[in-house]
């Protein structure tokens, strides 16, 4: 994917040029206190969301998959209502809410399912549920 990461000592890091910060834990409970602190002190300036049960992401307030989808469509002849979106993490809420049709994966973070109870669940990532859904939708064999 070309994604690069760097582990840094935040006490020595200036923060300039940082697009996103990931906090990863073995146990999801280890992130709760950090999440509470970040939301209390930076919730008005940052998007704080889980991309996986054990991965907390922090980025600019105006950054989300929903914003990215809307930006992508700006110069194309499609609207958000024309889009289908699939999600499995809390960082998918905005995108799923904006798309014309959103689907939640069976293996999705329970917090995503709670945030989007109206969306249909389509199956597991490991079972290629997205590919199977699209193949059926478009008549591909």
What are these regions (language model features)?
Residues 1-86:
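Conserved acidic, metal-coordinating active-site core of Asp-based
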Residues 57-141:
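Mg2+-dependent phosphoryl-transfer enzymes with acidic/Ser/Thr/Gly-rich catalytic loops
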């Amino acid at each position: 994917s070309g994604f690069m990461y760097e582990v840094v000592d935040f006490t020595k890091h200036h923060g300039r040029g940082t697009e996103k910060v990931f906090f990863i834990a073995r146990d999801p409970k280890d992130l709760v206190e950090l999440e509470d602190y970040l939301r209390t002190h930076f919730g008005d300036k940052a998007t704080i969301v889980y991309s996986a049960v054990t991965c907390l992401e922090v980025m600019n307030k105006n950054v989300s998959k929903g914003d990215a989808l809307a930006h992508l469509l700006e110069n194309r002849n499609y609207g958000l209502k024309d889009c289908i979106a699939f999600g499995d993490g809390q960082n998918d809420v905005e995108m799923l809410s904006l798309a014309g049709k959103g689907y939640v994966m069976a293996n999705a973070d329970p917090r995503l399912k709670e945030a989007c109870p109206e969306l249909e669940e389509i199956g597991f990532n490991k079972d290629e549920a997205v590919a199977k859904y699209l193949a059926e939708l478009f008549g591909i064999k």
